Amino acid sequence: MSVIRELSSFLSVSNFAFSLVTSLGNILVIRALFKASSIPANVKNLFLSLAFSDLGVGFVSQLMAGIIFAVILNTASKEDYNLTSLCPTVINLWLYLFYFLRAASLLTLTTIAFDRLLAVSLHLRYQELVTSKRVTIVLISISLTSFITALIYIFLPKSNQMVAAVILLVGYFLKTVAYVRIYKVVKYHQNQIYSQNQLRNAETREALRQRKSAYNALFVYFVFLVCYLPFLPSVILYFINTSDISFLIAKFSSLFLIYLNSSLNPIVYCWRYREIRQILKSTIKKILRLDENMT
């Protein structure tokens, strides 16, 4: 059972460390998003929702995970591998927060995908149809749906793994369909612009701006896919045989990858959005100058 000790040690230290990284990174990104003026309002609101979910992951859920794995490590060091001694209330609270925040992220990313699809498809009509009020209603609906989804996971323990797998599969499918459609629409409009030269300058600029925004959202989705994809087979394998220690290790490792996604998103924002990168540089310089003045 030394494997459990080693895994618990790694996950405890890693979750504590990345909890700090995730929290600081998303606090800086949230500040930058509020100050950014070049990002479309609807995209900004959706990314703010995603960043707040990631902040909740780092500030609460991942920190709790580090504590739980530290407790597991402590009990394992005493040659006690009975994990049922862990407080059920704490475990359920951790799982609830984990699935609430992850469901919110999944639904927000799906919304971003379809928002970008509407943007590249509708062009100038997009602002008329996709209003800030409607985006706000969607974000409230996402919070309520995430709340209910997390409750289902907690109160249906015998089938919660399958619920998680189904939700992930549906999310993967919808986002993939949206981005494939975005690619086709962008390709079609590119051919129009290059072959006809009949589009008005304003419409051409808007099409190019929405195409760039769609590509930026695609990178966020790609990072999400890399971090979440291993979780699906690990859940299925663990559901088939809960007594196999290797399946349990795979599941815990895939959970850490999901947490890692919340640390990587701020990096993607900085990479893909020049204004966010500049605001963050300015903020960090101010913090460093303040630190120098204090010393």
Name each region found by the language model.
Residues 29, 65-68, 146, 150-153, ...:
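Structural signal for membrane-spanning alpha-helices in multi-pass inner-membrane proteins
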Residues 107-114, 178-194:
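Membrane-water interface of transmembrane alpha-helices
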Residues 145-184:
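Extracellular-loop-to-transmembrane junctions of the mid-late helices
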